Amino acid sequence: MDYKKSGVDIEAGYKSVELMKEAVKSTMREEVLGGIGGFSGAFSLAKIKEMEEPVLLSGTDGCGTKVKLAFIMDKHDTIGIDAVAMCVNDVVCAGGEPLFFLDYIACGKNYPEKIATIVGGVAEGCRQSECALIGGETAEHPGLMPQDEYDLAGFAVGVVDKKDLITGENIKPGDTLIGIASSGVHSNGFSLVRSVFTMTEESLNTYYDSLGKTLGEALLAPTKIYVKTMKEIKKAGVKVKGCSHITGGGFYENVPRMLPDGVKAVIKKDSYEVPPIFKMLAEDGNIEEHMMYNTFNMGIGLVLAVDPADVDTVMEAVKAAGETPYVIGSIEAGEKGVTLC
């Protein structure tokens, strides 16, 4: 008996690392110290001395059961983008700049080419976020997971000067809410998605005129990364008052997380066009409206609270970053929460 016969292929692990090296190298920043393969990733903080009071920020998350679609479609090149997005978008909600990222893949069996493809997606997410992929782990779990399946999670660290920290504490009645478009379902609510739609290769490869693509393409579209967007807003000289990443729990759970006591967010549902994938989900799954807005992002991946005087500047900055903004509502006095009207 040896380790390979028990289900763990060390040589496959070595091959995976070799295949992913170029992708990982493409994410490096000058602050990264050392090469690939060390016991820990090293990142110099010398540059943050320029900040008055640097604050480190962290975020960790995964892709949930969205990975099931990747298994069925045998498409693994974008799921890594989702893992990065879920973490760095949380970091930018506090006004931070992502510095580095680490990934964790647990798999039933290490197929080097597949693992390298997944990490290639992670690297792409890191490039979009301008953060370095400085470490990771691929763990083979024979007997615990099916051979063809895996789970993917990540961890991001960022930094912000304390004076630039977005806390939401200064949000007040009269402030404007700006929503930034999502790419679709992003990485939340997929357990419900998988209950609504038949999850077979045939069904996912079915083209729908209403979507302008196949169902699988619509669902597997990678989560938007809003790092560049927030940098553009900051470069424009605007201090965002509050920022919410619309993930699991939708508007109802996430928008209140940025609000102080005594104010509520009033969001106008007709202020933007809800993408067709959500309409299809609601109709095919007979899902009530409140549940839709309490589960999915409904086409809005990020919600900002800004001073009315800054609205035009923020809208232009978001567009300059290549994203689509909408004025979706305002802040009113009342019990902390969200009202959709």
UniProtKB/Swiss-Prot annotation:
CDD domains: PurM. It is an enzyme of class 6 (ligase). Its EC number is 6.3.3.1. It catalyses: 2-formamido-N(1)-(5-O-phospho-beta-D-ribosyl)acetamidine + ATP = 5-amino-1-(5-phospho-beta-D-ribosyl)imidazole + ADP + phosphate + H(+). GO terms for biological process: 'de novo' IMP biosynthetic process; adenine biosynthetic process. Keywords: ATP-binding, Cytoplasm, Ligase, Nucleotide-binding, Purine biosynthesis. It holds the Pfam family AIRS. SUPFAM superfamilies: PurM C-terminal domain-like, PurM N-terminal domain-like. It comes from the Bacteria. It is found in: Cytoplasm. InterPro entries: PurM-like_C_dom, PurM-like_C_sf, PurM-like_N, PurM-like_N_sf, PurM_cligase. Pathway: Purine metabolism; IMP biosynthesis via de novo pathway; 5-amino-1-(5-phospho-D-ribosyl)imidazole from N(2)-formyl-N(1)-(5-phospho-D-ribosyl)glycinamide: step 2/2. GO terms for molecular function: ATP binding; phosphoribosylamine-glycine ligase activity; phosphoribosylformylglycinamidine cyclo-ligase activity. GO terms for cellular component: cytosol. Belongs to the AIR synthase family. HAMAP family: AIRS. This is Phosphoribosylformylglycinamidine cyclo-ligase.
